[in-house]
Amino acid sequence: MKVTTRNPWLWIPTLYFAEGIPYFIVNNISVLMLAKMGVPNGMMGLFTSLLYLPWMIKPFWSPFVDIIRTKRWWIIAMQLLMSLAFIMLTLCMPHPSVAEIASRNTPIGIFDVTLILFAITAFASATHDIAADGFYMLALSTKNQAAFVGIRSTFYRLSSIFGQGVLVYIAGYTETHGLGFLGIEAGDIPASWQLTLGVTALIFSLVTLYHTFIVPRPATDHPRLDTNHRKAGAGAIFHEFANSFATFFTK
């Protein structure tokens, strides 16, 4: 692996901005979108609450992120997976009828693919959180870790403003006024959310492309299994997993 270093200002702001976007898409935008599409609260409540589960249970698989591959690999791989999920969410957006939306009785079954893609995004995002936070500790000196803690927090909050403010505004404006140059008429709720997810997919894909080249490759970023252990196969992996799991719960 070629070791590279980068000015932290080049990648920390965008890394933590990217960390927040999928979290707010899955836990906030999904609920608002389904409600606007006319899905009854009782039907969507269970499914959308389950989408938060990956962040609750991520300690159970975080040891695998330490054991297998580098933190950088996990960051880029999960961002690529989430970019693909956002693209698929845009392309597979269901379009319930105006009557279904108005009746507030849109069947949640037509959103099966959408919910699966949100679930994939949730697991990828939780895994990305593990890798990004670990990478932050590896790639920066103790001094820089302290210096940039406010920066990472600020850009995570900016992603909240983007996810819960800018994207919601785009959907609301498009629904109210339409966008004639895109063929979206006023009142077309499904198209307004399709556009919103399309904007998300575009921005997140560009950030992912940027990170592919800019995120550094520090010498300290390596799997816990060295080459000899990796040749030992699954036994060594699960041995390391057990050690990591035990360490986590004894802290």
Each language-model region and where it sits:
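Intracellular juxtamembrane helix-capping segments at the cytosolic ends
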Residues: S30, F123-S141
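Interfacial helix-cap and linker-helix signal at transmembrane-aqueous boundaries
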Residues: L34-A35, V65-R69, S97, I170-E175
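C-terminal ends and interior cores of transmembrane alpha-helices
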Residues: I75-I108
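Central cavity-lining transmembrane alpha-helices of secondary-active solute carriers
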Residues: M44-I67, L80, Q164
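Intracellular loop-helix junctions on the cytosolic face of multi-pass helical membrane proteins
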Residues: M1-R6, A99-L115, T127, A139-K251
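Helix-loop boundary and gating motifs at the non-cytosolic
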Residues: M1-W55
